[in-house]
Amino acid sequence: MVANPGGGSTDAGGGPVRHIPVLLDEVLSALAPAPGKLILDGTFGAGGYSSAILAAGAEVIALDRDPTAIASGQAMVAAHGGRLKLVHSQFSHLADHAPQGGLDGVVLDIGVSSMQIDEAERGFSFQKNGPLDMRMSAAGVSAADVVNRAKVADLIRIFHFLGEESQAPRIAHAIEKRREEKPFETTRDLAGLIELVTPRKMKDKIHPATRVFQALRIFVNDELGELAQALFAAEAALKPGGRLVVVTFHSLEDRIVKKFFSDRAGKASGSRHLPVAHERAATFAAIGKPMVSASEAEAEINPRARSAKLRAGLRTEAAAEAADMSLFGFPNLASLGKLGG
């Protein structure tokens, strides 16, 4: 499944975008903000969730790894008289900015923000020509670095696993051939090549470059690793009765959140080899339905909501468990950081 990261386009790479928080009513229902409560918004973005949480009377610690979002949010900080603390940080580091076991709620809205899609110079959209960057902050390798330097086998892994792209080998080999002549510099450079290699068919609902752009963005920003670390950090930071609410936009993210809550439900998992499994105390209990999606009415108003899924859990009295990345079963794509040396 490929998400539309914002606005009035069904293409995952761009289109006109509205700054509308997705599943806002459902998020507030699951999060239950109220006066006297301290909520951490791990993905401040344009401030949609934080604004609604503040309106309910709670105090907010809001994080964002994008310095542009932090700068844009200063007016909101000034308007709320100390009830909003805005921090430049990745949400995987939320434990550094919140009292351990002291939060009443954590909300995470995963993926690229509508503001980032709007800015062509950030390189997130194949519909807006700009530098092939895709970094949510200025640190680390860019999408151009990956496309121009990664081994073909590594490009195939990235496109196949993170983009669920069935044409990954064909696209990767075409990239290798083209970059020998001229390096990729812009989003249109890459999107144009993909269009030539895998032309759009009449039945296709998404642009041919959608899955590759998604894969590169996720890889460059280590989005799956960030999400997994944030879930573990939230488990330790929430007080008993605290609420963890996560909104995702594609199947890889949702799979991680689903697996986390399933594991933290504490149910023993024996097998024919080890029929008696150790019973574990649940660290989270379910809040409402296992998964909530947007109504047709919301999806019509905000197309980004069409692929959104919300999962939520209520923190129990049990001690937080150790972080274990092997729980999620995805390959260590971070090992590709050398990009072919």
UniProtKB/Swiss-Prot annotation:
Chain residues that bind S-adenosyl-L-methionine: 47-49, 64, 91, 109, 116
Catalytic activity: cytidine(1402) in 16S rRNA + S-adenosyl-L-methionine = N(4)-methylcytidine(1402) in 16S rRNA + S-adenosyl-L-homocysteine + H(+)
Keyword entries, A-Z: Cytoplasm, Methyltransferase, rRNA processing, S-adenosyl-L-methionine, Transferase
Cellular component GO terms, alphabetical: cytoplasm
SUPFAM superfamilies: Putative methyltransferase TM0872, insert domain (SSF81799), S-adenosyl-L-methionine-dependent methyltransferases (SSF53335)
GO BP annotations listed: rRNA base methylation
UniProt-listed Enzyme Commission number(s): 2.1.1.199
Pfam families per UniProt: Methyltransf_5
Main location, first listed in the record: cytoplasm
Classification via InterPro entries: RsmH (IPR002903), SAM-dep_MeTrfase_MraW_recog (IPR023397), SAM-dependent_MTases_sf (IPR029063)
PANTHER family with a match to the protein in the record: 12S RRNA N4-METHYLCYTIDINE METHYLTRANSFERASE (PTHR11265:SF0), S-ADENOSYL-METHYLTRANSFERASE MRAW (PTHR11265)
Function according to Swiss-Prot or TrEMBL: Specifically methylates the N4 position of cytidine in position 1402 (C1402) of 16S rRNA.
Family of this protein: Belongs to the methyltransferase superfamily. RsmH family.
Name of the protein this chain belongs to: Ribosomal RNA small subunit methyltransferase H
Organism, scientific name: Rhizobium leguminosarum bv. trifolii (strain WSM2304)
